[in-house]
Regions:
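Conserved acidic, metal-coordinating active-site core of Asp-based
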Residues: 98-100, 108-231
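Short, acidic loop-to-helix structural element flanking the phosphoryl-transfer center
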Residues: 18-34, 81-87, 153-157, 180, ...
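Mg2+-dependent phosphoryl-transfer enzymes with acidic/Ser/Thr/Gly-rich catalytic loops
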Residues: 1-4, 15, 20-21, 189, ...
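Residue-level signal for inorganic ion chemistry
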Residues: 31, 42, 66, 171, ...
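Short active-site oxyanion
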Residues: 35-39, 59-60, 170, 229-230, ...
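Active-site phosphate-binding/coordination module
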Residues: 22-136
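Residue-level detector of anion-binding/catalytic polar loops
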Residues: 37, 101, 195, 250, ...
Length: 307
């Protein structure tokens, strides 16, 4: 029986318009009402992930930064696996060599070692064109984008960030030019103690080797006394592979997932635009109800046998 449902966010829980559908919202609430744990396992930072849950009036625990930090429903962080500053320095040096913008996640949330104008230029020239090319939505409104920018913590250069005590959870970047991102990937793989994955052809996410969605999910399940066989995990992209390749009760790929993701999963769900997450939840609840009926019938049969 499934006791923990773990869902990726972009391309999975969210549809291509960037929000959680009414059917999926109702399914998640019903799942939680039946006592089954629901957790979001995302590459987003806490604020960006919570923004979407708040818009849907949903609340749950979250694994953010692709496994680097887990948050309870109140926003308290635990199970933290940050990048050592020495490793972060190597990564940032490689980024500089390739002219890559360093999109950094720390305990402050989104963090930058450049100025605001450079950040805005990065989104205009790299992120937005890449997201548009994929047909996805990351910010539903300009207000959402403006709010994100207003929350960014700016440092004066990498030495300023590396010299403070704040932990670095993740360093990522996006290039609209795929040749540039591929060259960066080749260079990054020469650094030890890191885990580098992509959610699309245009991006790169880097965390500590112990900060992976799969590792974080198993750690979280242990705190709830839930075994791997009682977990359903669903996702669509490369940063989901560490959890979808685990020996879990069910591993599901969305219909819109990459071929690599589909190859490691036991189930293919409908796409994120066809309420794939809701479909999986409804199936779980239906199976649980059927199992409950069988148990009731069995108990009733035993009672009659004693007459």
């Amino acid at each position: 029986m499934i006791r923990l449902f773990a869902s990726d966010m972009d391309g999975t829980l969210l549809n291509d318009k960037g929000y959680i559908s009414d059917r999926t919202i109702n399914a998640v609430k019903k799942l939680q009402k039946h006592g089954i744990h629901f957790i979001v396992n995302t590459g987003r930072d806490y604020r960006a992930a919570k923004r979407e849950l708040d818009a849907a009036s949903l609340s749950c625990d979250m694994i953010c930064h692709s496994g680097a930090c887990t948050y309870d429903v109140h926003g308290n962080g635990f199970h933290i696996s940050s990048l050592p500053k020495s490793i972060a320095k190597q990564i940032l040096t490689v980024f500089e060599r390739h002219g890559a913008f360093a999109d950094i996640a720390t305990e402050y949330g989104k963090t930058s070692i450049t100025d605001k104008n450079t950040l805005l230029s990065y989104y205009k020239n790299e992120v937005f064109p890449a997201v548009e090319q994929e047909g996805k939505v990351y910010f539903r409104t300009w207000h959402d984008f403006a709010m994100m920018v207003s929350k960014v913590r700016f440092f004066e250069g990498k030495e300023s960030l590396l010299g403070c005590k704040t932990p670095i959870y993740k360093i990522s970047t996006t290039f609209f030019d795929q040749d540039k991102i591929n060259a960066l990937k080749d260079d990054i793989h020469g650094i030890d103690q890191l885990h580098a994955v992509s959610t699309s052809k245009n991006d790169l996410e880097i965390t500590h080797v112990n900060a992976q969605k799969g590792t974080a999910l198993l750690r979280y399940a242990q705190t709830k006394k839930i075994t791997p066989s009682q977990i359903l995990a669903v996702g669509d992209s490369g940063n989901d592979l560490s959890m979808l390749s685990l020996d879990l009760g069910v591993t599901a790929a969305m219909a819109n997932a990459s071929a690599t993701v589909k190859d490691v999963c036991s189930v293919i769900a409908p796409s994120n635009d066809q309420d794939g997450v809701a479909f999986l939840i409804e199936d779980i609840l239906e199976q649980n109800e059927l199992a409950a009926r069988v148990r009731r019938s069995f108990c009733l049969a035993l009672d009659y046998s004693k007459i």
